[in-house]
Amino acid sequence: VLILGTGYLGKALAESLRKAGHTALTADIDPQKAIYEADVADQASMQGLAARIPSPQIIVMCASTRGGGEEAYRNLYAHGTRNTLEAFSGTPVIFCSSTAVYGITDGRWITEEHNVYPSSGKNGLLIQAEQAVLAAGGTVVRLGALYGPGRCALASQYVTKGKALPGAMDRWLNYIHRDDAAAALHLLCTLREPPAGIYNLTDRTPMQMGEIYSYLSNLLGKPAPQPEPLPAEARRGFSNQRISCSRLMALGWEPLYPS
């Protein structure tokens, strides 16, 4: 397995595969984080990577923009996906995307059959990358918000600043623990035939933001944060949806952290 991007999720996936006896090769723009240094946004870099390593059985693209803007998305996802597919033509690819591409704002349940709505330029670039992977017979995994050891933006904002994330308290949020995400990708990598198509990757329990803050308030003995009203144009940029992960669970994956 070749893992492109060894950040929060990619590192956990590599460790999981190696513990199970699989060979996990890693590549990252930061040479301190991976076996190979490579920049997916650079065509020559990816061609060089393909020349240096054995032909992988499968590739997992889980690089992150690390909070970058639209140009970072274009380089990493639009250019990076194209460069990867060209350099490793014929190799199955698993592309880590986001449930944000659905762009639903009315709280309905969402499956992989729902249409996607590019509510922002960033989401449009993610959709473009997804389409390229699917056209090549690959797999798209749409992840909810990652959390786990040392990482949870919602809790961090509340604990350190006493503030809530933007959006209404009745907004539905969809999370996935890093270890569960790594386990799901591990499963997809090691199935006899890599399943093409789209898979949602969230825990089994969407929760409203106010419900989460109420739980944290009781747990920590702190007042729950107050929501800040947002103008209508800002509200349209925040998804409000409940994501189903039934398709992935049908393959045998079960989250250790179901809520």
Model-derived regions, located:
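N-terminal Rossmann-fold NAD(P) dinucleotide-binding loop
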Residues: G10-K11
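NAD(P)H-binding glycine-rich loop region in Rossmannoid oxidoreductase-like domains
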Residues: Q32-K33, E37-S89
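Conserved Rossmann-fold NAD(P)-dependent oxidoreductase catalytic core, especially the SDR/UDP-sugar
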Residues: R82-G121
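Conserved beta-loop-beta element that borders a ligand/cofactor-binding pocket
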Residues: S98, Q128-P149
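Glycine-rich "substrate-gating" loop/helix at the edge of Rossmann-like oxidoreductase active sites
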Residues: Y117-S120, G144-P149, A168-R178
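Glycine/proline-rich active-site loop of Rossmann-fold NAD(P)-dependent oxidoreductases
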Residues: G124-I127, L146-G162, P166, D179, ...
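Mid/C-terminal beta-alpha module of Rossmann-like enzyme folds, strongest
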Residues: A182-E233, S239
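C-terminal amphipathic/interface module of NAD(P)-dependent oxidoreductases
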Residues: R236-S259
